[in-house]
């Protein structure tokens, strides 16, 4: 559902169902933005972000952290995540966050 929503807005979307698949996708191409669910099968989204940053040193890739956990804000702060969305979330909230973060990254790249 998430990828369909973002594709409708014109974004190229790559999905992964677990941490190892996500890391393999990042090896092929570093994303412009990541939407990461804190609760992933086997390993969690926090582990993925730590490993992603350790391997590729890409602190400038914006991240939206999805979680039903009330601790998501603390986790996001600890990981340097730009934005969080509670689960369940409204599609329009995700769209606004993605648009804002993509625009911010583009303006930084141009300066």
Feature map (PLM): residue ranges:
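Two-component/phosphorelay signaling modules centered on CheY-like receiver
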Residues: 1-14
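Residue-level signal for the "D+5" position in two-component response regulator receiver
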Residues: 15, 40-43
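Acidic catalytic/metal-coordinating carboxylates
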Residues: 18, 44-47
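Short amphipathic alpha-helix used as the core "switch/output" element in two-component signaling
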Residues: 24, 46-59
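Active-site beta3 strand of CheY-like receiver
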Residues: 29-35, 40
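Alpha4 helix (beta4-alpha4-beta5 surface) of REC/receiver domains from two-component response regulators
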Residues: 47, 69-86, 96, 100
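Hydrophobic/aromatic residues positioned on beta-strands within the core alpha/beta folds
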Residues: 64-66
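Receiver (REC) domain switch/active-site region of two-component response regulators
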Residues: 90
């Amino acid at each position: 559902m998430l990828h369909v929503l973002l594709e409708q807005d014109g974004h190229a979307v790559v999905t992964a169902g677990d941490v190892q698949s996500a890391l393999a996708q990042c090896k092929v191409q570093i994303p412009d933005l990541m939407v990461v669910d804190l609760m992933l099968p086997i390993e969690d989204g926090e582990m993925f972000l730590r490993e992603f940053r350790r391997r590729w040193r890409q602190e400038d890739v914006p991240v939206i952290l999805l979680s039903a956990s009330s601790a998501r804000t603390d986790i996001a702060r600890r990981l340097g995540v730009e934005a969080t969305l509670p689960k369940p979330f409204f599609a329009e909230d995700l769209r606004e966050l993605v648009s804002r973060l993509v625009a911010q990254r583009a303006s930084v790249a141009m300066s």
